Amino acid sequence: MLAKTDPVINDLIKQEENRQRHNIELIASENIVSGAVQEAQGSVLTNKYAEGYPNKRFYGGCEYIDQIETLAIERAKELFGADHVNVQPHSGSQANMAVYQALLEPGDKILGMNLTDGGHLTHGSPFNFSGQLYDFYSYGVADTNEQLDYASLAAKAQEVHPKMIVAGASAYSRTIDFPRLREIADQVGAYLMIDMAHIAGLVATGVHPSPVPYADVVTTTTHKTLRGPRGGMILCKAEYAKAIDSAIFPGIQGGPLEHVIAAKAVAFGEALQPEFTAYTKQIVANAQAMAAVFDQSDLVRVVSGGTDNHLMLLDLTNSGLNGKELQNLLDSVHITVNKNTIPFEKLSPFKTSGIRIGTPAITSRGFKEKDCEQIANLILEVIEKHDQLEAMTAISEAVLKLTDQFPITQAKFLD
């Protein structure tokens, strides 16, 4: 139908589908949803308006919508052990915005992770609403090991006395010590909000410790390692439920995207299966296999010396390339990464000294450790031989052979 109604859009979708099939996707925030998740999101639920919450709607005809949203909520509660869950946020950024609005006043002091050290725009960037509406102070990693500097964070908290401490990251490869963060927050009487967007899938299966018992509020996206549709979610203690729900609706959103919420419910159901635990363990094993290869090279340096989760940062200082240059070179041989700042960055965010690499999407295709070691070696080969046409052609052919070997439609962890 789409091909007939709008052939231009249809053709572009087909081209994107072809790109995904024939590229090795290493962007840490991307994944490949199951056919069931995709089917739910493309359903007739997109036709339905449902302002409000289950059994408290401002529109009629929501009897099935209520059941679907309730299922999403209950599955998320089971998955993460949360008192209360709101599945309506359209994105992780909107989930974070709602938490700030629910618990803070404009101008309140917040302590968040420095973007350069691995934080997120919504954790206080001056270019983001968070840094414009609230008085953010930053903490980061230690210069000795590039891991979170909890002592420095605690000292900063004592100095600033923030009303909230925000933790979680978009480019941090190590396990986060949530009990320590709770202790620091309690010492200054601050709320503790954890943004677990990147590690939610790992948390769901116990591969990464859970922030839920320690945080007042936890926000997340529902894609990335959780392998659901693009969207957001908030988990909180029961005492904050009313404030959080009111901040989402009518605070910052109107009608929820019920077709996306249905897809979230499906993804949560998938994450409750034993196969998903095996999948998340493989994500980490694959990332560690890649990091081990990079760690043996003189061309790159693995930030913090390794990874405990799904991603790693590579310092390209010794390679003669910046992040943007390597991103473009890898694109030319069908490997997708993103340029990324590294701790104590010296280049602009439009160039960067590093790249970020993640394994969720390739693990969804069925890649194992040996395959990931091969990918790492291909990346090193691009760095070393990027000015040799014959070598780059051979690398491109090797990548296409791998993507043919692990087609998306036959991915091990998909239906």
Swiss-Prot record:
The modification N6-(pyridoxal phosphate)lysine is found at residue 224. InterPro entries: PyrdxlP-dep_Trfase, PyrdxlP-dep_Trfase_major, PyrdxlP-dep_Trfase_small, Ser_HO-MeTrfase, Ser_HO-MeTrfase-like, Ser_HO-MeTrfase_PLP_BS, SHMT-like_dom. Its EC number is 2.1.2.1. Pathway: One-carbon metabolism; tetrahydrofolate interconversion; Amino-acid biosynthesis; glycine biosynthesis; glycine from L-serine: step 1/1. Its cofactor is pyridoxal 5'-phosphate. The record marks 223 as: Plays an important role in substrate specificity. Pfam families: SHMT. Keywords: Amino-acid biosynthesis, Cytoplasm, One-carbon metabolism, Pyridoxal phosphate, Transferase. (6S)-5,6,7,8-tetrahydrofolate binds at residues 115, 119-121, 348-350. It is found in: Cytoplasm. It is an enzyme of class 2 (transferase). One of its GO terms (cellular component) is cytosol. It catalyses: (6R)-5,10-methylene-5,6,7,8-tetrahydrofolate + glycine + H2O = (6S)-5,6,7,8-tetrahydrofolate + L-serine. One of its GO terms (biological process) is tetrahydrofolate interconversion. Its main location: cytoplasm. GO terms for molecular function: glycine hydroxymethyltransferase activity; pyridoxal phosphate binding. Belongs to the SHMT family. Homodimer. Catalyzes the reversible interconversion of serine and glycine with tetrahydrofolate (THF) serving as the one-carbon carrier. This reaction serves as the major source of one-carbon groups required for the biosynthesis of purines, thymidylate, methionine, and other important biomolecules. Also exhibits THF-independent aldolase activity toward beta-hydroxyamino acids, producing glycine and aldehydes, via a retro-aldol mechanism. This is Serine hydroxymethyltransferase. It comes from Latilactobacillus sakei subsp. sakei (strain 23K) (Lactobacillus sakei subsp. sakei).
